[in-house]
């Protein structure tokens, strides 16, 4: 039940300079020349690897069914797409398509409970629903024996929903959606998307409103609207079912006909037609909000996804501002250093699209100069066009990303989504193949012609400046009304009894065999083979992480890691980016509190040159002072943005209160403005020498290539890498805070916030290596760990005060904290916190895990295992986790038996030994003028602090 705008201004993504792990020093191996000279695989060869064969059939009632067979795992993705979205909403009913999507999860006539309950019983993974302008989709990936149950469930809500929809459910989900809207609006830049849509698609254009809708229109939604929408829009002849995974068309057809065939055809739905608008003149708007830096965004309307020029526009946008080596990146960020970030993109929907270019100015630079240069560079690109090399690099990056994504059968972007989106939006499941055919032969002239046609028209410029928010925020009319206290629950009306089919035994997880060897320089190599896609994933993991930061140099690890790709002793940052794009490789740096990691995702056809590039980045970073200053400025802007973002404010505030200010886990891991400014080049090179070195790391690989080939390739680039003479770094976790005598509240005042962000936590004595750790995790699955857990069901599904609540252990190598997070509407902050305290206290005292909860949780955890490890990335992550905690390689195969042995009593004992309900620290980020009087009624000490501008 997720709505995500496809486009936001750059200010919404100011989490700049994300920390990246670093590699240690070695002799400057001469890898740059061979990498740059290596001939990558031909683009046509890569395109040929993107193939999703399918069979399609149509039932008599008009339901289209597409089946793709993929036997790599005993799972099937089930996707149901309806050809209706927010563009089809009548005037005065904005947001209704998305609100109706929520109601589809609240039970149908023969499955009247919350939909997620049935999904967990099946062991489903990757389940959700989304709404955009053009379509509404529902999806889940289930174990193969649960496929029939999933089809029964989806068909019941397609054909037999209305008898289960009540006024109480409508009112509740209205509140949930309005809190989803508040949650988005409450973010810095959260009102920008409304302004973009209003400017580019003025009423009465079908795209003149966002899918989330307006508060007033959501207030007006009625049961009659629900009935009409379902009858008019949700017939089988307006839907497509896609099955992708461990199933054939011959196996699927009888099941689909059995469950969907009897559903009557509905009215013929004619999706709204929409012309691509054109502004009569350039339009400019200035907005202010709690952002750290000025962003300048320019927007042009563009054609929809079926237009022949779509691919050319997308590639052009990548070259201009999407690639790491983009024109805007090279000039505005690297060379002239006028901007801390840039972007460009082509965001296409079914009927229309939006082209966007963006630059976020360095705080010390005149924004007018940034905009002037942005305009000049766009004009220059349109006039000159791209080079052949730029087009090939953009195309290769696109194809490589697609190959990696198609390892997954379902979820938000797997094979089922690819086939369904093509069918529903372009009337062709193979639409992706048509686009790739164009991509494989695309010329610079075609890209230039498309950009000249669409980007020389009048544009909309939106400048977002730091300051007090001046956009209009809309509140719901019934914000102060109680939810969940209305009339008694209405009875479900069953128009046709449809018994649920049984679920056969789910296959046990078959985790790949992990093999171990040692490279020539002594680094451990952990390897598993997966041949679902022609790709190789390599992680170099080092025992560092943000806990390696000195107390007075917080953010050092993140700043250092952010510099490894910004130039080596033989390659510039631009050359690194261009080489990576030619190879279709992706190198990411990160890790977390305890590890720093460098992860390469490579096309196996380009494995050796990709490894050469990775090795050069890890072993030979230049750490040029100019690059340090540039990346430091980016990271400082990121910190300043964190200090304006509710969730980040809460996290930065609570960490030292949980772990103790002296603990390495206290953070903030991104640092402060002062600590980042204090870091020198010597600090950065010292970090690399102490932590990013072969005697402090290990290599993890998942590949379709055999171990012998992988080992030889790694020895070729890492085998001669030796540790420097300086001593390895050490960490100390001796500092531990005294447990608080009682719970307390810290209120961070963030004026004019429509929501409050509640973040509670405490340090536990849980050992992640201990026998009771899994019991603790599943106890939390009853209390706060998933959608059906008590905290979420109370505040979201019963009260309607929040879009989502979660309780979760924050597990690090040397400390485990328990946390609760709940964004809630501002006027219910006190009530919501009181409910969180009550639910947690009762769970840890008189209302522990029930037998029904135990059965549901254990069934779900066992059933989900095959789906959890569908991808190479998931296998790679599990291998690293097992290594860090000293677990056996087959840990995830064994854990099912551990689940089966659990009892309600064992889960209760683990939770009660770990959590003390009377010793929570509760951080609340919200408008103190609204929130503080509510909190004073709870009987806890309240400390009020003002939101920091800088630290």
Task: State what each model feature region is.
Residues 1-25:
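Gram-negative bacterial Sec-dependent N-terminal signal peptides
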Residues 23-66, 248-288, 295, 299, ...:
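Proteolytic maturation boundary segments
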Residues 66-68, 73-91, 95-99, 113-160, ...:
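M16 family metallopeptidases and their MPP-like homologs
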Residues 156-165, 259-267, 375-386, 617-623, ...:
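A common structural junction motif
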Residues 167, 174, 227-259, 458-459, ...:
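Non-catalytic, conformational "gating/processing" segments within enzyme and secreted inhibitor domains
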Residues 176-184, 275-289, 395-406, 602, ...:
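Short, conserved secondary-structure transition motifs
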Residues 217-222, 226, 676-679, 684:
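Alpha-helical scaffold elements lining the catalytic groove of polysaccharide deacetylases
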């Amino acid at each position: 039940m997720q709505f995500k705008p496809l486009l936001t201004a750059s200010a919404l993504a100011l989490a700049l300079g994300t920390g990246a792990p670093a590699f240690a020093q070695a002799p400057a191996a001469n890898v740059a020349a061979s990498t740059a000279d290596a001939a990558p695989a031909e683009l046509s060869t890569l395109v040929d690897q993107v193939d999703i064969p399918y069979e399609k059939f149509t039932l008599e009632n008009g339901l289209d069914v597409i089946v793709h067979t993929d036997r790599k795992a005993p799972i099937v993705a089930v996707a149901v797409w309806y050809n209706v979205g927010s563009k089809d909403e009548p005037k005065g009913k904005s947001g209704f398509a998305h609100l109706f999507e929520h109601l589809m999860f609240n039970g149908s006539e023969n499955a009247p409970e919350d939909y997620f309950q049935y999904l967990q019983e099946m062991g489903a993974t990757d389940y959700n629903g989304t709404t955009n302008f053009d379509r509404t989709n529902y999806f889940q990936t289930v174990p193969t024996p649960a496929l029939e149950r999933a089809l029964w469930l989806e068909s019941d809500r397609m054909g037999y929903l209305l008898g289960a929809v009540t006024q109480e459910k409508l009112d509740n989900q209205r509140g949930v959606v309005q809190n989803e809207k508040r949650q988005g609006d409450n973010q810095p830049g959260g009102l920008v998307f409304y302004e973009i849509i209003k400017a580019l698609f003025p009423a009465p254009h079908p795209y003149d409103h966002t899918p989330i809708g307006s508060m007033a229109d959501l207030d007006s939604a009625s049961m009659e609207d629900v009935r009409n929408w379902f009858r008019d829009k949700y017939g089988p002849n307006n839907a497509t079912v896609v099955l992708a995974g461990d199933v054939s068309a011959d196996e699927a057809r009888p099941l689909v006909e059995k469950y969907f065939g009897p559903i009557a055809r509905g009215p013929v739905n004619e999706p709204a037609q929409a012309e691509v608008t054109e502004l009569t003149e350039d339009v400019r708007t200035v907005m202010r909000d709690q952002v750290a830096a000025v962003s300048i965004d320019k927007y042009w309307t563009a054609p929809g996804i079926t237009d022949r020029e779509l691919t050319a526009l997308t590639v052009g946008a990548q070259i201009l501002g999407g690639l790491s080596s983009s024109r805007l990146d090279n000039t505005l960020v690297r060379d002239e250093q006028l901007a801390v970030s840039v972007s460009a993109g082509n965001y296409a929907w079914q009927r229309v699209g939006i082209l966007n270019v963006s630059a976020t100015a360095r705080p010390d630079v005149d924004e007018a100069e940034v905009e002037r240069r942005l305009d000049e560079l766009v004009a220059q690109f349109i006039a000159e066009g791209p080079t052949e090399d730029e087009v090939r690099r953009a195309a290769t990056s696109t194809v490589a990303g697609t190959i990696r994504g198609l390892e997954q059968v379902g979820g938000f972007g797997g094979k089922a989504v690819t086939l369904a989106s093509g069918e529903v939006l372009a009337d062709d499941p193979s639409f992706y193949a048509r686009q790739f055919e164009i991509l494989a032969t695309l010329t610079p002239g075609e890209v230039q012609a498309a950009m000249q046609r669409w980007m020389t028209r009048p544009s909309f410029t939106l400048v977002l400046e730091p300051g007090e928010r001046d956009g209009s925020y809309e509140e719901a009319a019934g914000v102060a009304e109680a939810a969940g206290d209305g009339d008694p629950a209405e009875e479900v009306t069953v128009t046709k009894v449809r018994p649920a089919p049984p679920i056969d035994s789910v296959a046990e997880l078959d985790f790949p065999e992990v093999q171990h060897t040692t490279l020539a320089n002594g680094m451990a190599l952990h390897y598993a083979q997966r041949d679902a896609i022609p790709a190789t994933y390599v992680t170099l993991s080092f025992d560092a992480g943000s806990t390696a930061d000195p107390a007075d140099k917080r953010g050092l690890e993140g700043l250092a890691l952010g510099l490894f790709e910004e130039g080596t002793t033989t390659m510039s940052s631009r050359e690194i980016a261009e080489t990576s794009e030619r190879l279709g490789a992706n190198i990411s740096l990160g890790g977390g509190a305890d590890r720093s990691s460098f992860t390469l995702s490579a096309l196996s056809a380009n494995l050796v040159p990709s490894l050469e590039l990775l090795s050069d980045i890890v072993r030979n970073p230049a750490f040029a002072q100019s690059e340090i200053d540039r990346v430091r400025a980016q990271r400082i802007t990121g910190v300043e943005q964190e200090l304006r973002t509710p969730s980040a404010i809460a996290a930065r505030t609570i960490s030292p209160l949980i772990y103790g200010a002296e603990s390495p886990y206290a953070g903030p891991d991104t640092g402060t403005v002062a600590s980042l400014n204090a870091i020198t080049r010597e600090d950065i090179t010292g970090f690399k020498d102490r932590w990013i070195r072969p005697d402090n790391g290990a290599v993890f690989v998942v590949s379709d290539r055999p171990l012998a080939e992988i080992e030889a390739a790694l020895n070729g680039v890492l085998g001669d890498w030796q540790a420097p003479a300086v001593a390895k770094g050490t960490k100390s976790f001796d500092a531990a805070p005294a447990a608080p005598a009682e719970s307390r509240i810290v209120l961070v005042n963030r004026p004019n916030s429509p929501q409050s962000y509640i973040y509670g936590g405490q340090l536990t004595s849980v050992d992640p290596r201990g026998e009771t750790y899994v019991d603790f995790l599943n106890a939390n699955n009853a209390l706060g760990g998933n959608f059906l857990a008590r905290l979420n069901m109370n505040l979201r599904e019963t009260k309607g005060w929040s879009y989502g609540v979660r309780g979760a252990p924050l597990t690090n190598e040397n400390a485990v904290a328990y946390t609760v997070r709940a964004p809630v509407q501002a006027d219910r902050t006190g009530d919501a916190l009181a409910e969180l305290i009550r639910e947690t206290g009762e769970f840890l005292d008189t209302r522990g895990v029930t037998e029904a909860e135990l059965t549901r949780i254990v069934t779900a955890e066992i059933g989900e295992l095959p789906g959890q490890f569908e991808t190479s990335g998931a296998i790679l992550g599990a291998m690293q986790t097992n290594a860090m905690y000293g677990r056996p390689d087959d840990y995830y195969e064994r854990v099912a038996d551990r689940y089966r042995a659990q009892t309600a009593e064992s889960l209760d004992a683990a939770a009660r030994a770990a959590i003390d309900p009377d010793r929570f620290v509760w951080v609340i980020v919200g408008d103190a003028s609204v929130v503080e009087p509510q909190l004073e009624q709870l009987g806890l000490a309240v400390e009020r602090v003002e939101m920091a501008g800088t630290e």
